[in-house]
A protein has these predicted regions:
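Flavin-dependent oxidoreductase catalytic cores
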Residues: 85-88, 102, 106-107, 116, ...
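A cross-family glycoside hydrolase active-site/sugar-binding cleft signature
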Residues: 92, 121, 139, 159-163, ...
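Conserved radical SAM core fold
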Residues: 98, 166-168, 189-197, 201, ...
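C-terminal helical cap(s) of enzyme catalytic domains, especially alpha/beta-barrels
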Residues: 129, 135-137, 176-183, 260-275
């Protein structure tokens, strides 16, 4: 029987309007979507945790007169000068380029006021960031953009980056509109051109080279400061074992909800696992 009413088609869970729009765009232009930030899908986060407070078996503290210790020490395994933080929360790496010099300086000031550390990110260290940060972690990434041994010696810790939660196994991207004259000079790149970062370190042939690179970084800094190893949360149990065996002081696990300046949409939404799922595998 025919009906005057138009047939209402329900949206498919697999091929909703957003997915169809993405497919049409890729078919028309032959390009995949590039965007920043983190996954839009709902994933378990630290906000989902529920704490067990004190009652009878655990005696409660009077917060206004009894202190709760939040000090965190990182790098006691091998470093001569471990990092001591006032809180167990740090600011992750965000590059100068994806962020302005003013923002990087502000992050350093905020971290200092809160008694914690901030991290350089891809593209190197700016003088403003070093001056404003009491505790600064210097990243060594596959791109080696802006990598400077002199700046390395100014850092309070080094973070060897193997991957990122928003794009594990994939390289980075800095859109040309953010490649200013200063960014181009620091990275030795042409101004205003989209730049891609490598997905793996150019002087490595396998996992065994991680140990060699960590030893090189320790020799450059006279074994004074901690060496972190950062990785995207994928094969967590195996990756953490390799990092520990290679001699890392600290292993950083970056879950899929971590943000990025720019990468493929499919990487952000469909690779890696959340931080909460990764932590039990890491320990």
């Amino acid at each position: 029987m025919s009906s005057d009413k138009s047939i209402q088609r329900e949206e498919s869970a697999s091929f909703n309007e957003h997915s169809l729009s993405y497919i049409r765009q890729a078919a028309e232009y032959g390009l995949y979507e590039i965007r920043g930030m983190g996954a839009k899908r709902r994933v378990p986060s630290f906000d989902d945790l529920i704490f067990l407070s004190a009652s009878a078996s655990r005696y409660p503290l009077e917060g206004y007169r009894e202190k709760c210790e939040s000090k965190t020490v990182l790098g006691t395994r091998y470093a001569k000068q471990p990092i001591e933080l006032g809180i167990p929360i740090t600011i992750a790496g965000m590059s100068f380029g994806s962020l302005s010099a003013n923002v990087k300086e502000a992050l350093g000031q905020a971290a200092t006021q809160m008694g914690t550390s901030t991290t350089t990110g891809d593209g190197g260290m700016t003088p403003e960031e070093r001056e404003s940060s009491k505790t600064l972690v210097y990243q060594c990434l596959p791109s080696r953009y802006g990598f400077n041994p002199n700046d390395l010696r100014k850092a309070d810790a080094i973070e060897m980056v193997l991957g990122q939660g928003a794009k594990p196994g994939g390289g980075g991207m800095l859109l040309g509109q953010k490649v200013s004259p200063r960014v181009a000079q620091m990275r030795t790149l042409p101004e205003g051109i989209d730049q891609r970062s490598a997905c793996r370190h150019p002087d490595w042939t396998g996992p065994d080279d991680l140990k060699i690179k960590i030893e090189e970084l320790r020799e450059i800094t006279d074994w004074k400061i901690p060496v972190y190893v950062k990785m995207g949360a994928t094969r967590v149990r195996e990756d953490v074992k390799l990092a520990v065996k290679a001699g890392a002081d600290v292993v950083v696990i970056d879950g899929m909800q971590g943000g990025t300046a720019a990468t493929q949409q499919v990487f952000i939404e469909h690779t890696g696992i959340p931080t909460l799922a990764a932590l039990p595998l890491a320990v």
